[in-house]
Swiss-Prot record:
Domain of life, per lineage: Bacteria
Cofactor details (free text): Binds 1 iron-sulfur cluster per subunit.
InterPro entries on file: FeS_biogenesis (IPR000361), FeS_cluster_insertion (IPR016092), FeS_cluster_insertion_CS (IPR017870), FeS_cluster_insertion_RrpA (IPR023063), HesB-like_dom_sf (IPR035903)
Lineage of producing organism: Bacteria, Pseudomonadati, Pseudomonadota, Betaproteobacteria, Burkholderiales
PANTHER family: IRON-SULFUR CLUSTER ASSEMBLY 2 HOMOLOG, MITOCHONDRIAL (PTHR43011:SF1)
Keyword Metal-binding recorded: yes
Molecular-function GO terms, alphabetical: 2 iron, 2 sulfur cluster binding; 4 iron, 4 sulfur cluster binding; iron ion binding
Protein name according to UniProt: Putative iron-sulfur cluster insertion protein ErpA
Source organism of the structure: Bordetella avium (strain 197N)
């Protein structure tokens, strides 16, 4: 009797470096339609400042730099520069509407502390 042994490597898929939610992409699409410029992309960045040391920023940009990380979703593009990307690995960029208002939200697993408003953090 012959026994056949097969080894199957069951590794988890690699972590997604950055999540751009459907809700955020849909809101960006709406904002781009209002602007009337199909060349615009949403740029997310991290800069020094805020009450916790770093703060998030959002802006529209027509230029995609060679070293930008580009995420495509729902026909819109999210851009992140390399310096900001290192602080955003594993983060989720979302858009929420609730009783507190409507805003883009970044859920960042790298942030060790955040301020009350959620726009600044430390690592």
């Amino acid at each position: 009797m012959n026994a056949i042994t097969e080894t199957v490597d069951l590794q988890a898929p690699p972590p997604v470096p950055l999540v751009f939610t459907d809700s955020a992409a849909a809101k960006v699409k709406d904002l781009l339609a209002e602007e009337g410029n199909p060349e615009l992309k949403l740029r997310v960045f991290v800069q020094g400042g805020g009450c916790s040391g770093f703060q998030y920023g959002f802006t529209f940009d027509e230029v995609v730099n060679e070293d930008d990380t580009v995420l495509d979703k729902e026909g819109v593009q999210l851009l992140v520069d390399p310096m900001s990307f290192q602080y955003l690995v594993g983060a989720e960029i979302d858009y929420k509407e609730d009783l507190e208002g409507a805003q883009f939200v970044i859920r960042n697993p790298n942030a060790t502390t955040t301020c009350g408003c959620g726009s600044s953090f430390s690592v």
